Swiss-Prot record:
InterPro entries (UniProt xref): Rossmann-like_a/b/a_fold, tRNA(Met)_cyd_acetate_ligase
Keywords: ATP-binding, Cytoplasm, Ligase, Nucleotide-binding, RNA-binding, tRNA processing, tRNA-binding
GO biological process, alphabetically ordered: tRNA modification
GO MF annotation terms: ATP binding; ligase activity, forming carbon-nitrogen bonds; tRNA binding
HAMAP family noted in UniProt: TmcAL (MF_01539)
Catalytic reaction annotation: cytidine(34) in elongator tRNA(Met) + acetate + ATP = N(4)-acetylcytidine(34) in elongator tRNA(Met) + AMP + diphosphate
Cellular component annotations (GO), alphabetically ordered: cytoplasm
Cross-referenced NCBIfam families: PRK13670.1
Enzyme Commission number(s) of this protein: 6.3.4.-
Organism: Thermoanaerobacter sp. (strain X514)
Record's protein name: tRNA(Met) cytidine acetate ligase
Amino acid sequence: MGILGIIVEYNPFHNGHLYHLQTSKELTKCDYTIAVMSGNFVQRGEPAIVDKWKRTQMALKAGIDLVIELPVVYATSTAENFAYGAVKLLDSLKIVDCISFGSEKGDLNELTKIAEILLEEPIYYRKALKEYLKSGITFAKARELALQKVINNNEIEKILQTSNNILAIEYLKSLKKIGSSITPFTIKRKGSLYTSLELKGEFASASSIRKHIFEKGLEGLEKYIPDFTKEILQSSFEKKQGPVSLEEFSNILIYLLRNHIPLNHIFDVSEGLENKIYKASYKTNNVEELMKLVKSKRYTESRIRHILIHLLLNIDKQIFKEFDGPNYIRVLGFNEKGKEMLREIKKKSPLPIITKVSQYKEKLSNTKMFEKDLFATDIYTLAYKNSSIAGLDFIHPLIKL
């Protein structure tokens, strides 16, 4: 039985995701599928539109057999940390044969070549990088030019400017870094770019679907999302459990910033940026507006988003030094095939499986990372329009299909 691993967010699940899942199963000829999925906060540096249990329902209805949560410290980090945490978790299961991910390039050889150079940093690459950095350009641009020089490929700029290619390269780097035996596959992305905000083409991006939901609701999305996604979203919204956006947390974030809560413990914060964020918090009450005030050529919106989410969730950069990947397997949901795989994982994986959250202290010698997930849920539910209690992780049942 071949087992396929995929790394997902399903924010929300749409027809492009369905295409990737079905094509991946056909390409790899795997009979079983495991998804490592971001929880209530996602890699863009924002809350998911609906919670992790609703998105687990979508995944299982689409044909995923087992859904495992990617710890929030990795789910909300840089592409490099996100990929490393997710790949390390899949590898730690000790049953996964293949991994499949989307990319705009769709060419594994080209992406692998780039991944190997970035991981190994051969002397000729380091020399070229140093030369370009001396000219005063940003690190990202210097890296791009250095790669272009050593690989002699004019498409490098195009490859490194699209988010799925960047993640694909990071997945390949992580597989190589940990010496994983998992075989990688890539599916060429179809339809709109990941960042596109327009509903168009055969497959719309998750960003454009979320934008439509916030502005116009669910009507008009039938062409882009499966019926089950629409039903799950509709049910959530009727219960006033979403749609959730970063703006819901504006007051908390502005309070923390005006109170000058230190930012220097957060990943990717420099002194100049810290002061700029503090100053901007006195000019607006809205977090989206704050990001526009801080954003510049030097400080990207993505970087600012991640800093704000880590401030909101109190994620310290030290945690990445304390852990080498996730130290537990948090199960969110499964079907009968997923139950079979859990039995195999229990036999083979060195990591504890957590299905009953109340037992986490007995199962984990270091609870710090897991408790960040619990805290993230408690913060996330503050955005619900109904009265929501804390501790949802302890009382929400596993999703079973």
